[in-house]
Amino acid sequence: MEIRVRHLPVVSSEMELLGVLSEGQLLDADNPDVLVGTLIGVEPVSISEHAHVFEATKVLMDHNLTTLAVVSESGRYLGLVRRHDLFDRFARMLATQESGAIISLEIAERDAALSRIIHLFEQNDVRVLSLSTEAHNDAEGTIGVTIKVNVREVSRIKHLLDHNGYKVVAAFGEDEDPEDLLDRVQEFMRYLEV
């Protein structure tokens, strides 16, 4: 698989990060014999080797880069992180490869006790695989909460949340097979007759 990058770090022979060169800078160069060092002019954008993935993503987005240089505390170039690498990391953090239902809620910011939601799930033998929040810039002061759980049956999860006063905006997963549900109801009716 080919992944296109538009920004490459420029380093000295001592592995000191000198700058970042963009594809546009190379294409705009009038002289094909121009030295790379003359094309880089600004302070190099980099991230510490100890930085969190959130910080790396913020720097990439703030500077509209496709790669981000990683440097040691002494400024030595260690490597680079690509947008694609961060995307893969977030996919793992959000448990996208795990089987289960995805539920999107809208809750008032003042009621945003996520521990209550998690406790509610745990009481009902549902394990939270991932949870993320997103602030909505609306007058009502709501936030979006997206939760991935280890069960696939959406109807049970929706009922649980609705019953506890949560507004389910969307739910993705599998609903129970109506035939299975009908069979269980019939078995229950036979049980009651006995």
Region locations from a protein language model:
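Short basic, glycine-rich beta-strand/loop surfaces that mediate nucleic-acid
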Residues: 140-151
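Short, low-order "capping/linker" segments at domain edges
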Residues: 150, 179-194
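A positional/architectural concept
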Residues: 1-6, 13-18
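Short acidic/glycine-rich beta-turn/loop cap or linker motifs at sensory/regulatory domain boundaries
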Residues: 12-14, 72-74
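Tandem CBS (Bateman) regulatory domains
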Residues: 1, 19-65, 73, 77-139, ...
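Conserved short beta-strand edge segments in small beta-sheet-based binding/regulatory domains
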Residues: 129-131, 159-179
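Structural preference for solvent-exposed beta-strand-turn elements
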Residues: 9, 132-137, 143, 171
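Short loop/turn microsegments at loop-to-beta-strand junctions
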Residues: 5-7, 65-66
